[in-house]
Curated annotation (Swiss-Prot):
Source organism: Wolinella succinogenes (strain ATCC 29543 / DSM 1740 / CCUG 13145 / JCM 31913 / LMG 7466 / NCTC 11488 / FDC 602W) (Vibrio succinogenes)
UniProt xrefs under Gene3D superfamilies: Hexapeptide repeat proteins, MurE/MurF, N-terminal domain
One Gene Ontology term from the biological process aspect of the record: lipid A biosynthetic process
EC annotation from Swiss-Prot or TrEMBL: 2.3.1.191
Keyword annotations from UniProtKB, A to Z: Acyltransferase, Lipid A biosynthesis, Lipid biosynthesis, Lipid metabolism, Repeat, Transferase
Protein name (record): UDP-3-O-acylglucosamine N-acyltransferase
Pfam family for this entry, one: Hexapep
Lipoprotein among keywords: no
GO molecular function terms noted in the UniProt entry: N-acyltransferase activity
Function of the molecule: Catalyzes the N-acylation of UDP-3-O-acylglucosamine using 3-hydroxyacyl-ACP as the acyl donor. Is involved in the biosynthesis of lipid A, a phosphorylated glycolipid that anchors the lipopolysaccharide to the outer membrane of the cell.
Entry's family note: Belongs to the transferase hexapeptide repeat family. LpxD subfamily.
Active site: 230
Chemical reaction(s) catalysed: a UDP-3-O-[(3R)-3-hydroxyacyl]-alpha-D-glucosamine + a (3R)-hydroxyacyl-[ACP] = a UDP-2-N,3-O-bis[(3R)-3-hydroxyacyl]-alpha-D-glucosamine + holo-[ACP] + H(+)
Gene: lpxD
Pathway(s) served: Bacterial outer membrane biogenesis; LPS lipid A biosynthesis
Length: 318
């Protein structure tokens, strides 16, 4: 799509340079034939290093645009990105015309649905009522329990177990808001990648990325009823206990443990070997190799001292 057509669609001033744009992506992931966006000056460093061919940007930030990147001046870059995402959204069905490739040793229940272009590896089992979407790749020795739904283009490694009722690759909860309070859907054009030896409990929801990937790295084990939002990256051999919620763009190192009902606020990083106790709330990036508890989050030993102090104060007041 011509950049000038994008400008016309968004009702923005025409660009100074014409170029062909094939997609929309983040500043970090964009290529010279993709467009990105900048809403705030705190992303200036990412913009300077971006390879994006064009960028939606406020007039006040034009001086930050690197050479080779064509600006489209917008009063509301994030909102215009949401509107633009619809133009580049893949259709939910019919994009792939190829017949699915199912390995001879795979077992597929008669009531399971396998979409066009899907690939099912050797010895993989897909049970009753499961839906494998178009373009999904399932590795070898996987076990997909009843009524699992795996949306299009999801990539799953070897020896992955997904228990009943889980949904992989649905759209994340992403909206931009107009001045009148309307909510404009951000179409999610990324994918989900689940690496080797991952096990997902029942009724998990793992959302596809807005751009790029949501990724669950190898060896990670996730309990029942867990929500992992768009663009999260969960490190190798991590443990996630029931009812955890990870907000969008949460990333973790390896061997991180999330206790039951703990949560993150998104756009933050949890370091290697960190442990979040049950109901802990992570609101900013934290170091690894420590145990944390409470909300506001603090080191577990400090939380224990606080609880003891509160108990002491209550006794004094009685």
């Amino acid at each position: 799509m011509k950049l000038s057509l994008i400008a016309q669609f968004l009702e923005l001033p025409l660009p100074s340079i014409e170029k062909e744009i094939v997609g929309i992506s983040s500043l970090e992931g964009a290529t010279p034939d993709e467009i990105s966006f900048v809403e705030q000056d705190r992303y200036a460093s990412s913009l300077k290093e971006s390879r994006a061919g064009a960028v939606l940007i406020r007039a006040s930030l034009l001086s930050l645009v690197p050479q080779g990147c064509t600006p489209l001046v917008s009063a509301h870059p994030y909102l215009d990105m949401a509107r633009l995402s619809k133009l580049f959204a893949k259709p939910p069905l019919g994009l792939n015309a190829q017949e699915p490739q199912i390995a001879p040793s795979a077992q597929i229940a008669p009531s399971a649905t396998i979409g066009k272009g899907a690939v099912i590896g050797e010895r993989t089992i897909v049970m009753a009522g499961a839906v494998i979407g178009e373009g999904v790749c399932l590795g070898e020795d996987c076990l997909i329990y009843p009524n699992v739904v795996i949306y299009r283009d999801t990539q799953i490694g070897n020896r992955v177990f997904i228990h009943a009722g889980s949904v992989i690759g649905s759209d994340g909860f992403g909206y931009a808001h107009t001045e009148r309070g309307e909510h404009i859907k951000i179409h999610h054009n990324g994918i989900v990648v689940i690496e080797d030896d991952v096990e997902l409990g029942a009724n998990n929801c793992i959302d596809r990325a807005v751009f790029g990937e949501t990724r669950i790295k190898r060896g990670t084990k996730i309990d029942n009823l867990v929500q992992i939002a768009h663009n999260c990256v969960l490190g190798e051999h991590s443990i996630v206990v029931s009812q955890v919620g990870l907000a969008g763009s949460t990333t973790t190192g390896r061997n991180v443990i999330f206790g039951g009902q703990s949560a993150t606020s998104g756009h933050l990083h949890v370091g290697d070997f960190a442990t979040i106790a049950a109901r802990g709330g992570v609101s900013k990036s934290i170091e690894g190799k420590k145990t944390y508890a409470g909300f506001p989050l603090m080191e577990h030993k400090e939380w224990l001292k606080l609880q003891a102090s509160l108990k002491h104060q209550l006794k004094k007041s009685q």
